[in-house]
Swiss-Prot record:
Protein location: Mitochondrion inner membrane
Entry keyword set: Electron transport, Membrane, Mitochondrion, Mitochondrion inner membrane, NAD, Respiratory chain, Translocase, Transmembrane, Transmembrane helix, Transport, Ubiquinone
Organism: Urotrichus talpoides
GO terms for MF: NADH dehydrogenase (ubiquinone) activity
Membrane-spanning intervals of the chain: 1-21, 29-49, 61-81
Topological category with respect to the lipid bilayer: Multi-pass membrane protein
Annotated protein name in UniProt: NADH-ubiquinone oxidoreductase chain 4L
Binding partners and assembly: Core subunit of respiratory chain NADH dehydrogenase (Complex I) which is composed of 45 different subunits.
Lineage: Eukaryota, Metazoa, Chordata, Craniata, Vertebrata
Major location (coarse): mitochondrion
Gene: MT-ND4L
């Protein structure tokens, strides 16, 4: 296993650890999720390029599309919670239930 793979996996684990530790604010949770998606994108791209599997070259692009949709929904939820309650605590999301 090369050093690049190890670094990308460490970046993913640090983002996952940040997501588990800093759950109180929605903005920090969204940043950790984006870090996880970025490390998955880099890992998938490097693996596809190393094994020369050109048929799967669209998979990282599809992952980026889903990451962009996740970021847009997360930011709109952040704006809605911030405008409604004035803070971005994750515990306020329980109040959004119908």
């Amino acid at each position: 296993m090369s050093l690049v793979y190890v670094n990308v996996m460490i970046a993913f684990l640090i983002s996952l650890l940040g997501l588990l530790m800093y759950r109180s604010h929605l903005m920090s949770s969204l940043l950790c999720l984006e870090g996880m998606m970025l490390s998955l994108f880099i890992l998938g791209t490097i693996m596809i390029l190393n094994i020369h599997f050109t048929l799967a070259s669209m998979i990282p692009i599809i992952l980026l599309v889903f990451a962009a949709c996740e970021a847009a929904i997360g930011l709109s939820l952040l704006v809605m919670v911030s405008n409604t309650y004035g803070v971005d605590y994750v515990q306020n999301l329980n109040l959004l239930q119908c």
